[in-house]
C-alpha cells in the first residue's frame, strides 16, 4: 500500500531528514519524516512564502494540515504571543510536529484531527495552511468551507 502525506496511519518505514531554517533573527531545527508533507532536507517554497509574508490578525492561530510543523512552529518563534494549534490527520505528522516543537523549545497545541473534527468548535483569528492539494478538490474545498 502506498502512503500519502494525508494518510491517517502511514505504514511506510520511517526515514528522517534533519535541517535548519533561518528567517529574520530566528533559526529553527526540524526533523522531516517519510510519509509526512514535506519529506525533504529543506523547507518547501510554498511554506517559506507563507512564513515570510504572514502578518497575524489576532492571537489565536490554527495551522491546518501541519505536517512536521514547520509553518506553525516558525510563526510561533516569530510571534511568541500567538496561541497556536497545529492539526493534522496523519499520526506521524502529529508525532513529529510535537517533537519539533520540543526540540525548538516552543509551546504549541498539537492535535490529531480530520480537518476540524477534533478541534471542539474552537475559533481562530487566522488559519494557515499549505493545502493538501494531492488529497483532491473535495478535501481542499471542505478545508476552506469549514473554516467559517
Positions of predicted regions on the chain:
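A short, charged helix-loop
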Residues: 26-32
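A short glycine-rich, Lys/Arg-flanked "PGG" loop and its adjoining helix->strand segment in the class I
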Residues: 141-148
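Conserved SAM/SAH cofactor-binding pocket of Class I
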Residues: 46-129, 135
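N-terminal auxiliary segments of SAM/dcSAM-dependent transferases
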Residues: 1-24, 36
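Class I SAM-dependent methyltransferase Rossmann-like catalytic core
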Residues: 32-41, 49
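Residues at alpha-helix caps and immediate loop-helix transition turns in enzyme cores, especially N-
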Residues: 42-46, 139-140
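A generic structural micro-feature
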Residues: 11-13, 44, 102
Amino acid at each position: 500500500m502506498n502512503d500519502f502525506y494525508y494518510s491517517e496511519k502511514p505504514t511506510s518505514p520511517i526515514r528522517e531528514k534533519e535541517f535548519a531554517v533561518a528567517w529574520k533573527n530566528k533559526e529553527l531545527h526540524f526533523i522531516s519524516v517519510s510519509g509526512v508533507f514535506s519529506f525533504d532536507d529543506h523547507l518547501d517554497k510554498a511554506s517559506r512564502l507563507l512564513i515570510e509574508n504572514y502578518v497575524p490578525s489576532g492571537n489565536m492561530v490554527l495551522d491546518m494540515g501541519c505536517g512536521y510543523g514547520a509553518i506553525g512552529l516558525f510563526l510561533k518563534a516569530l510571534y511568541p504571543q500567538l496561541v497556536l494549534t497545529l492539526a493534522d490527520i496523519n499520526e506521524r505528522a502529529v508525532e513529529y510536529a510535537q517533537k519539533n516543537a520540543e526540540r525548538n523549545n516552543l509551546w504549541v497545541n498539537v492535535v490529531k484531527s480530520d480537518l476540524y473534527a477534533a478541534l471542539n468548535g474552537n475559533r481562530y483569528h487566522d488559519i494557515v495552511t499549505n493545502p493538501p492539494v494531492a488529497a483532491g478538490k473535495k478535501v481542499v474545498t471542505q478545508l476552506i468551507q469549514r473554516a467559517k
